[in-house]
Curated annotation (Swiss-Prot):
Encoding gene, per UniProt annotation: INO80
Domain notes per entry: The DBINO region is involved in binding to DNA.
Species for this entry: Lodderomyces elongisporus (strain ATCC 11503 / CBS 2605 / JCM 1781 / NBRC 1676 / NRRL YB-4239)
Domain named Helicase C-terminal: residues: 1315-1470
UniProt-recorded Gene Ontology molecular function terms: ATP binding; ATP hydrolysis activity; ATP-dependent chromatin remodeler activity; DNA binding; histone binding
One cellular-component annotation, GO: chromosome, telomeric region
Keywords: Activator, ATP-binding, DNA damage, DNA repair, DNA-binding, Hydrolase, Nucleotide-binding, Nucleus, Transcription, Transcription regulation
Cellular localisation: Nucleus
Protein name: Chromatin-remodeling ATPase INO80
EC numbers, comma separated: 3.6.4.-
SMART domains recorded: DEXDc, HELICc
Record carries keyword Cell inner membrane: no
Composition-biased stretches (Basic and acidic residues): 239-250, 258-276
BP term (GO), one: telomere maintenance via recombination
Residue ranges, annotated region (Disordered): 33-57, 71-116, 239-490, 690-718, 1488-1549
Length: 1575
């Protein structure tokens, strides 16, 4: 049983007080009586106010026995000690403020009673600290020791101070031990009940382990004995082994006491069994320490002495208290340190102290004190930076003569106490007792020798430095002055009696009071636990009730608080954002306002600068126009009054002289308008003069100028001296020019005279080539300028130019510069000659070449000075960034003439490129030209915006001097009209699926990225690649619209042939006729052995018994047919059945074959209609003449029967005998071949295969034999069987299972081709000749197959045609009227060639550029055309082709505005088509494009009731035109087709023929519903 668990605070205090009371009473009885009875020593109370961490305050009492008083110092008003409590489980340190009250004075009047002073030494400073200074740190486990003041006061009231004096050191250690045990008991109970204070218990245990104080009193020993009684019964053999494994981490555990001996009746602690040598060494060390402590205690300095009531002071201290160390001090200050880990011994060696005499005591004591002081200073504690703490204790000492005996006893006790303090508890052996007696004797003698020194009233200082360490805690030693009256034996006996009494008391208490207290404590603990559990349950219930009530409110409160906080945060954030936005907006407005003002100023300045440049160009054009007279030649119908005003306005600036004409020096902000006009006029005059000077310098540098005469007067090659001319047609020109062509010749001649370049932009077909040739002949005839002339044309018109120059001007020598590199090298020798004169006898006059060749050989052309350069189809240099444009501009030419029928194809930039080519100095900035005209005109064409008429007039005024353009309707009255018709087609089922498949693969985001991302980047390669990908995507849609076979052709199908062909020798050995019949054989051969056939099969046939055996087993034998008597009723005898059984299948069919008058059509009508019509209904002969030929003659003649029924025969041949087979086998093979080496077998095989009867029946009857039957009037029923082989499959497949793709299906799978098929039939009937233009050469290949199938004669010209072939093809078309169709590619066959033999043009698919199509259609609509030209354009409804057509109309509008000055209104979608990529994206995203005919595309308003839209001027139709009536078919087949507005499928199906319905959905079964990858 653990006694500690039975003790509470009150019980521990009671036990302690009883123990001390009994001890004091026994000691008083044993002590010797004094001479004078001392006064009674009352215990002095010391109250302390303890403040816990919770703020509760309680009053506790400490007592001082005898006359020891802890009072205030003289220089201080009181000391407040702040006692630190241990920090447990992270709690803050609690401090107790102890206030010591002054004690009451005693009855002793002889000696002045002065209080004991408590002083604190901080570091090296030895002064007393004020009350506010930091109190000393004491043991934290002693801080909770409290004693009941009332109980303690009552007990000590009976104690006389002269009879008992309690040692302070012992009292301090006793209280500390009791407090430690009490604290440990609390921790154990708390950990046992609540299991939460384990940390405090472990900490207390660790403290006991570190200080070795867990057996310093008898309570520990009793507890250790009660824990385990078996620990004292350990055998001697296992004792040493178990001592090694002692666990010191648990001081009260049985492992810590196992193997240890207990000495009942003494104050020594538990110790291990040690050997004698070791005990001897420990005894010597203790004797040395005792001697040192005695010297230090007697060598104290004298101070204010205290009078003691008696000299017989008996110190009460435990024997051999471990950890007690006596150290000397230099003064009356004693160091008390509670932390043993911070005590450090002095490293300085201490000399052995010797006994000294009285005279030497003080000096030596002082020296020792000084040394010990230094050591103490070095042994400062490091905890918190605080110095050693010292307590000054003042003792009262009686006079020397009264108690000399007591002093002796005291000396002995003191010596004994020192010996016990230095000893380490040697054990209970006799040797140890003897050693202790020797030590006590020695100490007593030392005390006696030093007693005389301290006989006077002195103050002794006890240095109690309590420092806990591994070797033990340092206790405090009390040095007092005692007499040497008692001997060592008496002292020893006294202490033994004291120990025995102490042990007896404890045994009685443990046996009697222990169980009772234990039961009480258990009951109390259980009651407390029950109450605590109930309290916890009630508290939890109340807390839960309160929580239920307040949880919702807390949640709502927290939610509202967060929401309010969030709203406030958002409000201020929004407020700040609004303020920032307003501030930024205000700043932005200021910046924009300043920027706008600056832009307005700059705009005004640029406007004035632009107006200056335009005025300068106008004046330049006006000065040239006055000499060239373009208005008169062009023949425009403008108002003459407006022209007069404009000329008058511009004429006033003629001959002006401006002071400043440099554009960089002109101030456009301040100068007035008149000054700007004068400067512009001056610049225009200077530009004109410069142009004339350049032409003059070119003429002056000619090598053939006459040196004898004045060049300016006599040189006829300088036409600038001639002025305005009226030129007639040159005589050397072998043709007759029309009136407008002569005007054009005059305009060109005037341009040459003024040294100005020009553009001849007459409409295609008005003879630009003849006019340019005429101006060359004019220069040669009039001015003797024979060249050199350079003509650059496209490759397709090289031969045309060569032929026309040679034809119209035979005097010109034409050099055709084309061919291979070697050929061109030979041709270059004509102009490589030095000092070459170009006259009539020159090697060549005109050089004709192509754009590609001149770019490749530009270095050779730059060496020449060309008199005149003509560029045919000048739109080839429409890009000013191309190498072609730059190369041609670098040539040295006097004049340049550009021939083009379409100066503007796509945008105004192309017009600027041409103008810049002819006038590089005037039109030098494209940006300025774009600012002048391009933006407004192009935006007007696209978005139907207004156009400034004044700006348009100024544009025409600038362009007129440099460009001459006439249109056909104004100058050529005999030329027929040109009619353009758009034919709209629908997508077939296969085309719709292809179109939808492509449409599903388009991503709008990809298109947007392709049109925006790369356009903003500077990488041109990425830009080109994106454009190419978009164009390729559009091309796939166009291929679907043209024909689905452009993706994948229909395959030829045939069954798998399991056949092998016979091998033959060289074909050279064969004759002219190669017989390959029976060349194929089956892979399977049936081998028939010869012996089996000869001996078994063929031999039995010749035997007599074969017939009997055969007849016996034959089902056709008459004997076996007796049971079938009903056969005779059917008109057949058994013998006839027997004969039929011996025949094979063919023989039976031939015997049953008879001629009848009924035709196959009659049999079909008989089966399906039930009406059998007579042959007379199908006769072509007039019924009135039927008497001339008898019916019998018709019926008896097969030939006559066919002639009389031609319509029926034709119908049979076209429909009944041309139907495709309904089934195609998966595999085919010839019959299995029987292989036999017998001659009999081969003869029989040949007889069977080549039976004459069977062959004559299968083959048609010969005409001679049929004539013989007719002459003999043999009835038709008696004709021999013939022509039994069916003819329906023979006409289509020729007895073959190979299935070729159906051409009818090929035509009907494309909506365009089906429409073209109908159109060509109509055109051929009306004797038209057709030009068909294509964009894809692969589509031209498909068209050739179609024309071959339809047996139309055609020729073809595309980019792969050679130059010589092109010339021959054009010649054949013009001279051979039997050619019906001319297939051309738009780019190759649409330039420069004359195809006037055709009066119909068909565009199977349109070009991106509308001008390309215009040039292509003008190949037929040109001079020489006498018939009206009709242009058909095939367009697929609701597809990309319609949107391309709309875009082309916008470009045509730009041409009409610029060239003709017409600002007509067009309707189109507002799309930004500034670049080609955006044009392509517009085409892809413009409409639904699904081909469903739902009208959701761009042109949903196109007239769906009409397949043909006819217009002379291309204009889109606005809205839907309702036509409730019927429209006659334009194809002229005599039938009317009705098409309802609602587009219901029933009406559409009713309007189609059976063949169209049959072939329309065949694309669904082809297995190719998606385009092939990679196409």
């Amino acid at each position: 049983m653990n006694i500690l668990s039975m003790l509470s605070n009150d019980s521990a205090v009671q036990l302690q007080l009883q123990l001390q009371l009994q001890l004091q009473l026994q000691l008083n009885l044993q002590s010797a009586p004094s001479k004078a009875s001392p006064p009674t020593l009352l215990p002095k109370q010391t109250t302390a106010t303890t403040t816990n961490a919770t703020g509760n305050t309680k009053t506790v009492a400490r007592y001082s026995a005898g006359d020891i008083n802890i009072l205030n110092d003289e220089n201080s008003h009181g000391v407040d000690e702040s006692i630190d409590e241990p920090v447990t489980n992270g709690q803050a340190t609690n401090k107790e403020s102890v206030k010591q009250e002054p004690t009451q004075p005693t009855n002793n009047t002889e000696t002045e009673k002065k209080p004991l002073t408590l002083s604190i030494q901080n570091g090296a400073d030895k002064k007393s600290l004020p009350p506010q200074s930091q109190p000393p740190r004491i043991n934290p486990l002693v801080a909770d020791v409290t004693l009941s003041t009332s109980k303690f006061k009552n007990v000590l009231a009976h104690i006389q101070h002269d009879q008992l004096e309690i040692d302070l050191d012992y009292k301090f250690k006793f209280e500390s031990n009791v407090s430690l045990i009490d604290q440990l008991d609390k921790n154990q109970r708390l950990s046992q009940d609540l299991r939460i204070l384990k940390f405090d218990e472990v900490k207390s245990n660790n403290y006991l382990i570190s200080t070795h104080q867990f057996t310093t009193n008898y309570i520990d020993r009793v507890v250790a004995e009660d824990i385990s009684s078996r620990n004292n019964k350990i055998s001697d053999t296992n004792k040493n082994k178990e001592i090694i494994h002692i666990d010191h981490s648990k001081p009260l555990h049985h492992n810590s006491t196992r193997g240890k001996e207990y000495k009942w009746g003494s104050t020594r602690e538990i110790h291990k069994v040690e050997s004698k040598p070791k005990r001897k060494r420990n005894t010597e060390n203790s004797e040395t320490n005792n001697s040192r402590s005695t010297v230090s205690s007697k060598a104290s300095t004298p101070s204010k002495s205290l009078a003691f009531g008696s000299t017989h002071h008996v110190p009460i201290r435990p024997k051999g208290s471990k950890g007690t160390n006596l150290s000397s001090s230099s003064g009356p200050i004693t160091d008390i340190t509670n932390d043993s880990n911070n005590v450090r011994r002095s490293s300085r060696p201490k000399s052995k102290r010797k006994a000294y005499e009285d005279g030497e005591g003080e000096d030596n004591g002082n020296n020792i004190d000084s040394n010990s002081t230094d050591n103490n200073n070095r042994n400062k504690t490091q905890e918190g930076g605080r110095g050693p703490k010292r307590i000054r204790i003042k003792l009262k000492v009686k006079p020397e003569g009264e108690n000399e005996g007591e002093e002796k006893d005291e000396g002995k006790g003191k010596g004994r106490g020192k010996g016990k303090g230095k000893g380490k508890g040697k054990g209970k052996e006799k040797d140890g007792d003897k050693e202790e007696e020797d030590e006590n004797n020695a100490n007593g003698e030392n005390g006696k020798s030093k007693g005389s020194v301290s006989s006077s009233t002195t103050t002794t200082t006890t240095a109690a430095a309590a420092a806990a360490g591994g070797g033990g805690s340092t206790g405090s030693a009390l040095g007092t002055t005692t007499s040497n009256s008692s001997t060592s034996k008496e002292q020893k006996a006294f202490m033994r009696q004291y120990d025995n009494t102490y042990v007896a008391i404890w045994k009685d208490m443990s046996r009697k009071d222990g169980p009772k207290v234990s039961r009480l404590m258990q009951q109390s603990t259980q009651a407390k636990l029950i109450n605590l559990k109930k309290t916890c349950i009630l508290a939890a219930r109340e807390a839960k009730r309160w929580q239920v009530k307040n949880t919702k409110n807390q949640k709502d409160l927290s939610t509202k608080a967060r929401r309010a906080m969030r709203e406030m945060f958002n409000f201020w954030k929004r407020n700040e954002r609004i303020e920032r936005e307003l501030k930024k907006k205000h700043e932005k407005e200021l910046v924009e306002k300043a920027k706008r003002e600056e832009e307005e100023r700059e705009s005004k300045r640029q406007s004035r600068k632009l107006n200056f440049l335009i005025t300068q160009t106008e004046l330049y054009s006006h000065f040239i126009g006055k000499k060239i007279k373009t208005d008169e030649i062009e023949g425009t119908d403008a108002d003459p009054r407006i022209k007069a005003q404009e000329k008058a306005h511009l004429d006033k600036y003629a001959g002006v002289d401006a002071a400043n004409n440099d554009i960089l020096a002109i101030d456009f902000d301040n100068d007035d308008e008149d000054a700007l006009h004068r400067a512009a006029a001056q610049n225009a005059q200077n530009a004109l003069a410069n142009a004339q000077n350049q032409a003059k310098q070119f003429d002056d540098t000619e090598p053939f100028k006459n040196p004898d005469t004045n060049g300016e007067e006599m040189n006829f090659q300088n036409p600038t001296l001639l002025g305005d001319l009226s030129i007639e047609q040159p005589k050397m020109l072998k043709c007759t020019l029309k009136e407008y062509q002569i005007k054009g010749l005059n305009w060109l001649a005037n341009l040459y005279e003024q040294g100005i370049n020009g553009i001849l932009a007459d409409e295609m077909g008005l003879g630009k080539t003849v006019q340019s040739i005429s101006v060359l002949s004019y220069l040669a005839e009039t001015h003797n300028i024979w060249g050199p002339f350079l003509v650059v044309t496209p490759a397709s018109t090289l031969h045309n130019w060569q032929q026309e120059i040679s034809k119209f001007v035979p005097n010109f020598k034409v050099l055709p510069y084309w061919g291979h590199a070697k050929d061109r090298k030979v041709l270059r020798k004509f102009w490589d000659r030095k000092s070459l004169r170009y006259d009539k006898d020159a090697p060549f006059h005109v050089l004709v070449t192509s754009y590609q060749l001149i770019v490749s050989d530009i270095a050779y052309f730059q060496k020449m000075k060309w008199q005149y350069m003509i560029l045919d189809e000048a739109q080839a240099i429409k890009s000013s960034q191309s190498s072609r444009w730059k190369s041609l501009l670098s040539l040295s030419c006097r004049n340049r003439l550009l021939l083009t029928g379409t100066p503007i194809q796509n945008s105004m930039q192309e017009l600027w490129a041409l103008l810049h080519f002819i006038m590089p100095t005037l039109f030098d900035s494209h940006d300025e030209f774009s600012d002048w005209f391009s933006k407004d005109i192009e935006s007007h064409a696209q978005s139907n915006t207004g156009l400034d008429e004044q700006q348009l007039r100024r544009l025409h005024m600038i362009l007129k001097p440099f460009m001459l353009r006439r249109i056909k309707k104004n100058v050529q009255s005999e030329l027929g009209d040109k009619v353009e018709i758009d034919l709209f087609c629908d997508l077939t089922n296969r085309q719709k699926k292809y179109y939808q498949s492509l449409r599903s693969q388009i991503s709008i985001m990809d298109l947007i990225d392709a049109t925006t991302t790369n356009s903003s980047s500077n990488n041109s390669s990425l830009d080109d690649s994106s454009t190419t990908s978009l164009v390729n995507l559009v091309m796939q849609f166009r291929k679907v619209c043209n024909h689905p076979d452009l993706f994948e052709r229909a395959d030829v199908r045939s069954p798998m042939a399991l056949v092998k062909f016979a091998e033959t020798g060289s074909f050279l050995r064969e004759g002219n006729d190669l017989d390959v019949s029976y060349a194929s054989e089956n892979l399977i051969n049936y081998n028939l052995p010869r012996l089996i056939y000869d001996d078994l099969i063929s031999a039995n046939e010749n035997k007599n018994d074969f017939g009997s055996v055969y007849a016996k087993f034959s089902v056709y034998d008459p004997e076996n047919l007796r049971d079938l008597g009903w056969i005779s009723s059917a008109g057949t005898s058994p013998n006839e059945i027997q004969q039929l059984g011996k025949m094979n299948v063919l023989e039976r069919a031939i015997k049953l074959q008879r001629y009848t008058t009924g035709s196959p059509l009659d049999r079909i009508n008989y089966l399906y209609e039930g009406d059998y019509s007579s042959p007379n209904s199908k006769l072509l002969i007039n019924p009135q003449n039927q008497h001339m030929i008898s019916q019998q003659q018709i019926e008896n003649s097969s030939v006559l029967l066919d002639l009389c029924n031609i319509s029926q025969k034709v119908y049979e041949e076209m429909y009944l005998n041309t139907q495709d087979p309904a089934f195609t086998p998966l595999a085919s093979a010839p019959p299995i071949t029987i292989v036999c080496s017998s001659n009999n077998f081969q003869n029989k095989l040949q007889n069977e295969l080549f039976n004459p009867t069977i062959r004559s029946a299968l083959a048609p009857m010969s005409l001679n034999k049929e004539l013989e039957f007719m002459n003999n009037n043999t009835p038709l029923e008696l004709y021999p069987p013939s022509n039994m082989l069916p003819s329906s499959l023979s006409k289509v497949n020729d007895y073959s299972n190979i299935r070729m793709p159906s051409m009818d299906r090929f035509i009907t799978e494309s909506g365009k081709l089906a429409k073209l098929d109908e159109l060509l039939v109509k055109l051929k009937q009306e004797d038209h000749r057709v030009l068909i233009y294509f964009q894809m050469t692969k589509m031209m290949d498909l068209m050739e197959e179609y024309l071959t199938f339809k047996q139309h004669k055609y020729i073809r010209l595309d980019g792969s045609s050679k130059l010589d072939d092109r010339r021959d093809l054009v010649h054949d078309w013009q001279t051979k009227p039997e050619i019906f169709v001319f297939l051309l590619s738009t780019r190759a066959g649409g330039l420069g060639i004359n195809l006037t033999a055709a009066d119909t043009v068909v565009f199977y698919d349109s070009d991106w550029n509308p001008t390309i199509d215009s040039q292509a259609m003008d190949r037929a609509h040109r001079l020489g055309q006498t018939r009206q030209v009709t242009v058909y354009r095939l367009l697929t409804r609701n597809t990309i082709e319609e949107r391309m057509r709309d875009r082309a109309k916008q470009k045509e509008q730009v041409q009409q505005v610029v060239m003709e000055g017409k600002a007509t209104t067009i309707m189109s979608k507002k799309e930004d088509a500034a670049s080609k990529k955006k044009d392509v994206a517009f085409l892809l995203l413009g409409g639904s494009g699904d081909g469903d005919g739902d009208g959701t595309g761009v042109n949903s308003g196109v007239d769906t009731s009409n397949d043909v839209s006819k217009s002379t001027t291309p204009k889109p139709e606005v809205g839907k035109k309702k036509n409730n009536g019927n429209k006659k078919n334009v194809f002229g087949n005599g039938k009317k087709r009705v098409r309802e507005e609602d587009g219901e499928e029933e009406d559409a199906l009713n309007s189609k023929r059976l063949q169209e319905l049959y072939h329309e959905g065949e694309g669904e079964f082809s297995g190719t519903v998606t385009p092939a990858p990679g196409v």
